[in-house]
Curated annotation (Swiss-Prot):
Signal peptide range in chain numbering: 1-19
Keyword Signal: yes
Tissue: Expressed by the venom gland.
Residue ranges annotated as propeptide in the record: 20-39
Disulfide linkage: C42-C56, C49-C61, C55-C71
Keyword Disulfide bond: yes
GO CC term, one of those recorded: extracellular region
Alphabetized GO MF terms: ion channel regulator activity; toxin activity
Source organism superkingdom: Eukaryota
Similarity field: Belongs to the neurotoxin 36 family. 01 subfamily.
Localization of this protein: Secreted
Protein name (database record): U4-theraphotoxin-Cg1a
Organism: Chilobrachys guangxiensis
Length: 74
């Protein structure tokens, strides 16, 4: 009885492992690069820059303290 349960669990584990490997294979055409994901949600020049969204274009998040950072030109 225990051997049967062990064999069934082993087969289930192998089946789940194979399914996970097949689902992790992605095509580069189906994936978005990080700049493309944030394209519509970037922070403009002079606006406060939180950690969640990057500054637009070549702007950098600068300021005297972490709470006072704004998107500015480098």
């Amino acid at each position: 009885m225990n051997a049967t349960i062990f064999a069934l669990l082993l087969l289930l584990n192998l089946a789940m492992h194979n399914a996970a490997e097949q689902s992790s294979e992605t095509d580069m055409d189906d994936t978005l690069l990080i700049p493309e994901i944030n394209r519509g949600r970037c922070i403009e020049e002079g606006k406060w820059c939180p950690k969640k969204a990057p500054c637009c274009g070549r702007l950098e998040c600068k300021g005297p303290s972490p709470k006072q950072k704004k998107c500015t030109r480098p």
